[in-house]
Structure formats: structure tokens, C-alpha cells
Amino acid sequence: MSRPTGACPHAWRHQQQPLRGRMWAASPAFRRQLVLLRSLLPSPPAPSSVAGFPPSCPSCSSFLRVRTNHAMAASAGTVYEADAEAVVRRITPPLDRARHKGQAGKIAVIGGCREYTGAPYFAAISALKVGADLSHVFCTKDAATVIKSYSPELIVHPILEESYSVRDDERASVSSKILTEVGKWMERFDCIVVGPGLGRDSFLLDCVSNIMRHARQANIPTVVDGDGLFLVTNNLSLVEGNPLAILTPNVYEYKRLVQKVLNCDVDEETASEQLITLCQKIGDVTIMQKGKADVISDGKTVTQVSTFGSPRRCGGQGDILSGSVAVFASWARHFVLTNEQPTEKRKAASHAFEKNKRSTVTSDIIEFLGKSLEDICPAEH
């Protein structure tokens, strides 16, 4: 059935979306990450010129108004809560039987060593739970078997090496071989996550630095978390001037970034202005400062997500976030390329805590990731 001229192509969703779904949309479950996605979008044109989305549709054009308001007040350091519903509906790909494997996203996690095997698993499996079709992990040989045993859904590559397993006279050749092996896959990925379970071995970090440079040359969005932030803090050129780089520091990682880049301590009195300055100083990156309230900026605007998640601060929740952000970043970029671009993790954490209370662990939160997206974009539609 053809729709009337000027009608919103998503009108059926607006009409059928129950109140409960709208409550999910307004929740932190999507606001937290979708602010990051909006940062990846180019500045929007006037509503009347957005292809397929007439200005008469308030839901589909609301993110345009939000961006305009942000731009007007950015200089004043105003902090906004994100409007996620319109954005998530626009970027989430439909579950179409005509689509083939991989079209909903191919994500790669770069991390995993002898000491840390859980973090890369959490990031990679979260990407699948949110909706990516394929999730890869590039890790050391010591970590590969362990990570493979966690889940048969993950594609695990035992490619990375640590210093103890490489002779000094072999470092150059081994590093080149690692980059070549990862490079064979790079063009297939929609986004990579660097850092979960990476560790701080000097040779391994050098190899990952080369991988990040290769990803940048290939224009692959890169989410940097965990020890990837340690690497970037000590080598800012890896992300300087890269609008496809998303940094997700916790309070300690953010403090180190501020001290390194701005040569000062974190100032709570001017937190939003300092975050904007940090993004601008690094150049074009998006930063999500995790904490009691998550604060997100692309160097132009600042958005805060303060809705309650879970009081349980078990390890691994940041890894869930990085894997989820990678999926949304890939969907947003695909939307931009074919049409003209956080909250989910907090909502999932809240539901997991309601069910498990003090025994809540990271795998319980992962269980609710799919539900968070389903309430916004039902699979049957």
C-alpha cells in the first residue's frame, strides 16, 4: 500500500509503539550510546531536505531539533539528556529475510591475553546480543582456546603475540606478520573495539598500534576501551583528528587523559567545558566519560545520562558497553553512507539487578541486551 505524499515512512511504528516501548526509548538504555552515534553523523540539513523524512514527522525529525539546540548552547557548556527514540529507529536495520549474513554488522575485538580472557568475550558477545551478525576476537594464542570455549558463536583468531614468546631479532618480522594477518580481515569489519583484555605488554601494544593505524587508513570506526586507553594516552597520534574514534574511559582512565592532554587535573566545577576542550585538543574524537552519570561529547556538545542502572559494579560492564557501542556505530555509519547516524547497557543492568540483586554479574546484564533493543524496534516489524 502506497503512503500519502509527505507521510512518514515509519508512521506504522509511531502508531503501533505501546507506551511501554516509549518508556524504554526514553530510558538510558539507548540514550547513552545513541549520543555517540549522533556524534558520528554529519551536521544534518534542514528537516525538509532529509531524504524520506518530511518535517511533518515529529519523531523522525526530533533529532534534528536536538542537534540544533545543542549547537546553540554548546558554548555555554550546557549539558543535555539525549533523545534516542528517533535515532535508534532510523539506524536499526530491519530483520528482512532478503538480507544476508553480515549485513547487520561485523565487529572485531582486538584484545585478550594470558591474564585477561573475560573482557574480550564480554565485548564480542555483547555485540552479537545487540544485533551484529558476526563477532570476531583477535587475541594471543594463550587466550584463544579459553575464549573459544566460552562461546561457539565467536570467531577467534589466535594471532597476537606477547614479548615472552618473541625473540628480539624476530620482533620486526613477527609484528609485520601479525599486521598482515589482521589486515586480511580489516576491510570486512564495520567497526573494531580495541582494548578489552589487551594487557600492557610492550610488544603487544606496538602490534596493536599498527593495527589501529591500519584501521584508520581503511576508515573503520574504532572504539577504544580498557588497556586500549592506556595505549592511546601514551600515543595520542593514534586517534588525533580521527572523527571515527570513540573513547570510553572510566574515572581513572579519564583522569589520566586529562592530565596528559590538558596538563591539569579533572575539574568538577567545569566538567562539561573541560570535556569539550579535551575532545577538541585531541581532535575530532568522541569521548564518553563513564561514571555515576555518563557524560558524552564530540567536542561540540555535551550530553549526560544519569538514569539509574545497577548498584552492582561488577567487572566487565565497560566491556559490554564497548561491544554495544561498536554495533550502533556501525549501524549509524551504514545509515549515513546509504541514506545521505547509550543507554542500552544501563537499562539492561537495571533489569539484571531487579532479577539477581547482589548476585548480579556481567553475564546477567548481557542477557537483557536483546530485550532493550526489542522494545524499541520489535523484530516482527
Swiss-Prot record:
Its cofactor is Mg(2+). One of its GO terms (molecular function) is ATP binding. Residues 84-376 form the YjeF C-terminal domain. Belongs to the NnrD/CARKD family. It catalyses: (6S)-NADHX + ATP = ADP + phosphate + NADH + H(+); (6S)-NADPHX + ATP = ADP + phosphate + NADPH + H(+). Its EC number is 4.2.1.93. It comes from the Eukaryota. InterPro entries: CARKD, Ribokinase-like. ATP binds at residues 290-294, 309-318. This is ATP-dependent (S)-NAD(P)H-hydrate dehydratase. One of its GO terms (biological process) is metabolite repair.
